[in-house]
Design a protein with these regions (language model features):
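Residues in the recognition helix of alpha-helical DNA-binding motifs
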Residues: 108, 112, 120, 157-162, ...
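Short, intrinsically disordered/low-complexity patches at protein termini
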Residues: 128-130, 158, 175-181
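Pre-recognition alpha-helix immediately N-terminal to the DNA-recognition helix
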Residues: 72-79, 121-131
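Short hydrophobic/aromatic patches on the structural cores and recognition surfaces of FHA
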Residues: 105, 129, 155
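Alpha-helical bundle regulatory/interaction domains
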Residues: 1-85, 91-92, 96-104, 112, ...
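Short amphipathic alpha-helical surface patches that serve as generic macromolecular interface elements
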Residues: 123-126, 140, 156
């Protein structure tokens, strides 16, 4: 029993700043003792399907973009990557599809990438949102939905946290002439 007679659970019920409510104060980050088998950039699947090309006479055409939809060869992980690429974000729904627990999915992602499942998902969503902002003329709301972040507010908060920029300013900073329309969904 703890000093208040309630056991040790009282430690985890203390007030915490917003965003840390599910992480105990004594949480220690897990780390792989070896290099992850699959670095993030090797497993990311772009949402774009077509790439723009210019002919010698100046006409524009689009061809199928070569995308590796199974970058790891591990079926369940490749399915998970495709699930995220489709703009889905609920890890529990994905776990239920396979009859697994959320901790099973989290452990799989950790073993393969060295990242916690929720951190991997967030990085995937931010990376996809960045690509959508750069290469498309989608509205902020469409980018938020397509990337799996859900709402424009979530997109804004995530980009402020990651880049210290609002999504619209990020788009202006990253985009170069000719970027819009280079790829199509």
């Amino acid at each position: 029993m703890g000093r208040d007679g309630k056991g040790d659970a009282w430690k985890y019920r203390q007030w915490r700043p917003h965003g840390l409510s599910g992480i105990p104060r004594n949480y220690t980050e897990r780390k792989l003792k070896v290099e992850p088998q699959f670095p993030f950039k090797k497993v990311y699947i772009t949402p774009y399907r077509l790439q723009r090309h210019y002919a010698d006479d100046g006409t524009v055409s689009y061809s199928e973009l070569k995308r590796n939809l199974e970058p790891t060869g591990i079926k369940i992980f490749d399915d998970f990557l495709q699930y995220l690429t489709a703009g889905n974000s609920d890890l529990q729904v994905f776990a239920d599809r396979y009859g697994l627990k959320l901790t099973d999915i989290d452990s799989m992602i950790f073993v393969l990438t060295g990242m916690r499942g929720i951190d991997f998902r967030k990085k995937y969503q931010v990376w996809m949102a960045g690509q959508l902002l750069r290469w498309s003329d989608m509205s902020i709301a469409e980018v938020a939905k397509r990337s799996g972040l859900g709402s424009p507010n979530n997109l804004y908060l995530t980009f402020k946290r990651e880049y210290n920029l609002a999504p619209g300013y990020y788009r202006k900073a990253i985009r170069k002439p000719g970027d819009v329309g280079k790829y199509k969904l």
